[in-house]
C-alpha cells in the first residue's frame, strides 16, 4: 500500500523560514548521527497578518558575516539562509512550530512513498509563480535537485551525499515529480534531506541562463513571500 502524506499549508511564515532553516540543519544532523534528541518547542506565536498591510519597503537584517556568494545550493552557512531564505520555498520543509520534528508541505502539497521505500512521489501546488511571473512546474523541481544531486563540474554541493541513493528523477506531469532510489533509505532520513533549508527551489530557466552557477547572481527569482 502506498503511503500518502498531506497537510494544510500556510504562507504566513517569514519568521518561520529562519526557524525552519535552523530546524532543518538540526534534523539532518540528527538523522546522520542516529542519536535521538529532544528540543523544547519555542515559546512564540506567529502574529496574524495586518488587514491593510503596507506593501514594499526595505527589510534590514543584521548578520555576523556577509555571504561569500549568493548560491544557496553551494552554501552550508546561515549567512546565506538568513538573508536569502525568505525569498524561496522548498519542496517540503520542517515545521518551525515544533522545532522541526515534523515534515510539512511547502511547494509540494502532498507526497507518496512506495511500500519498498524506493520511490518518492511529490504532488505540487498549482498556480505558484516565481517573482518574474514564471509558472512553477515539476521541471523546476527536477532541475533544482539534479543540480544538487549530480552537480556539474566546478560546482560545490555540500548536500550531495544525502541523496546518494537517488538514481533518477522523473517528471510525470507539470505538477508531479518522482524520485527513484536504487536502494531504500530510512524514510525519515530521506524526507529530512528533501526538507533541508538550503534545498530551495530555483527556476529551470534561471539555471540555464546562468550556466547553472548562481554564485554572483544576487536577485534570481524565487517563489517565497
Question: Can you describe what each PLM-predicted range is?
Answer:
Residues 1-13, 22, 32, 36-37:
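N-terminal secretory signal peptides
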Residues 44, 62-115, 146, 223-225:
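N-terminal lobe/hinge region of extracytoplasmic solute-binding protein
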Residues 56-65, 119-121, 178:
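Short, well-ordered beta-strand elements
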Residues 110-154, 172, 178-183, 188-189:
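Aromatic- and charge-enriched surface segment that lines or borders ligand/interaction sites
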Residues 159-219:
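Surface-exposed binding/hinge segments that line
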